[in-house]
């Protein structure tokens, strides 16, 4: 049976009005207890229309002159019903409650009866007072109906992580917040990870009930993953930095961060031997089980670790661990496996330290030389149980090809781009770390002693990342079978790769190729001839003022092939090449926010089948002034294009992709239009500023990609608000589209309209990402009280599609004719040399 409300019928009310009463009791309540107040008059017990057993003790009695009207309810049933209601939702406030301890009759609207104390006269309920009672009952019924619908929504398939975050942020009911916190376990890890900044920001800056709902999930995931633990620690530190120093020291975010970094959240049963794979821990006890939530829907992850071939025969050597401890006083003496977080933290700290030291050097040439030297020394600490957090697969870092690193363009700082060789593995936490392959086995090298000092002692060169040694003689390295494979394959590599790059010499990149014979298969010759017959994109010349241009222009696949041929690990089938940009002195929290909005809009446009193209790139926030960025491969800035080619954009397109009517040019033109429309909408919605040609990339397929979202929403360069147009649309962009009268330009405007209609259909998904991050934030993009309101207004929810079309036409026309865009480009050319 459904829920039944215990209420006075109209018949009973009429009898109360007509008949005198000797009782002043007009309340219906549970027997009072020391701690319990009045209870809502709702119950999930069966209907009382046919009466309950008279032998049960009465809950309360209403007696009126003509006889006694008894309402008898089983006490245990009533208590159980109230407990169920309180545990499920706790929505009702009990507007019609009456305290049984009071002798004064209280009406349903909460006011005392005016005749209650008048000479002991019985209370009378007038017709005017019946209406408020009825309205209260109607509200209670509506609330009950809303609760039912809310529970059905929470348990439906439509309830996704975006809705969960929204209810967690907006709900003020602890019961609902606890329920949502429990439901986090039922979502995929990747889906929750996308909203990790929002979850942790709510944990830091919102009330205690929200924090209590979020913490069990965060703690559980930290026990399962080193990578998740470190990302939580980094984000907690970054988002707590806006608090006052005295408050920050004792905040919940700081306490949780210290708990994570203390490594107290490691799995309860440490694996001393790795022959036996451990199943995932049991699902933690829920705070509030919701109806319909099955156990299988709440299991956090179905993936279990499956052993690699190396793990089958390898166990941790305790003597090896003790040996490491003796050589490194920082390592705590323990017979358990080494501290989980230390190697990765030391690796990231080393990369950040390089960036800080580069910023102190005056010229770009000195920065480049220092970068190559520092990275070559870093290689002596590899391989290790370290990884790049921006990658999408598990791996171990084995080598950094130092001669390929470049310093990027920056006026005051020294961001740099590195390429990282990794070996893909099944689980970087449990898979064996690869054995170090000395470079002398397969190539000629210069001795370590010939390296520039860079302020690093020989002892530091030989040391490793805290607990992770060089693994040359470590038991936890390769299995016997793996070593056998190496011994079989190494001679082949040695004889066929005589033109490999010298390890520490930039000059030998070109000199080694002519010194030794190269053996090439006939199939390779045929393949290279066919590739030469095809159209080959141009290359950039070396520019001492911009060394990154040549590296970024080189096709990615060609770079991978070249670096693999020169790597001692390149023969291994699980070898992969990754790249990352390291930034020091920059706050990447706004970049992370922009990435989330771009990713959400990309998903929306894909769902709505709008062919807009954007490229969100991953952002890793390490602290409030450092982080890592995923590079966009096969792309160079429009500034570099114009500087290197000295051509207009349309002429460069013809040079790269052929004449106007070729299939390659038409494909590149369509890619340009779809990406330009997508980023124009992004720039309008987020009010992206600082749109000079150094911050707009052009890839090998014709797409444009906007980078550097340091000025969005309420912030602008130097807070001047100089760029007033909705987005950047220059005459060169229009020329690539075929001119104002071309079909592709009309296609561009049509895509703008379709994209805006689709975006406003899902506006709340975008708004909540930004709104939650505004809590407790001191970021420049949130300056002013109207940031969120202005963002909502740019979705134009009140306009018809015809009015939206007029708006798009006006924005396009205004952006093309914007004088401030031309002035800002001129300002950047005069001050920074950006073309």
UniProtKB/Swiss-Prot annotation:
Mode of membrane association? Peripheral membrane protein
Q: Which domain of life is it from?
A: Eukaryota
**Positions with biased composition (Low complexity):** 19-59
Main location, first listed in the record? membrane
Q: Where is the composition biased (Polar residues)?
A: 311-332
Can you list the GO cellular component terms from the UniProt entry?
cytoplasm; membrane; mitochondrial outer membrane; rough endoplasmic reticulum membrane
Q: SMART domains given for it? A: PI3Kc (SM00146)
Compartments (UniProt record): Endomembrane system; Mitochondrion outer membrane; Rough endoplasmic reticulum membrane
The job of this chain, per UniProt, is described as: Phosphorylates phosphatidylinositol (PI) in the first committed step in the production of the second messenger inositol-1,4,5,-trisphosphate (PIP). May play an important role the in inner ear development.
* Name of protein: Phosphatidylinositol 4-kinase beta
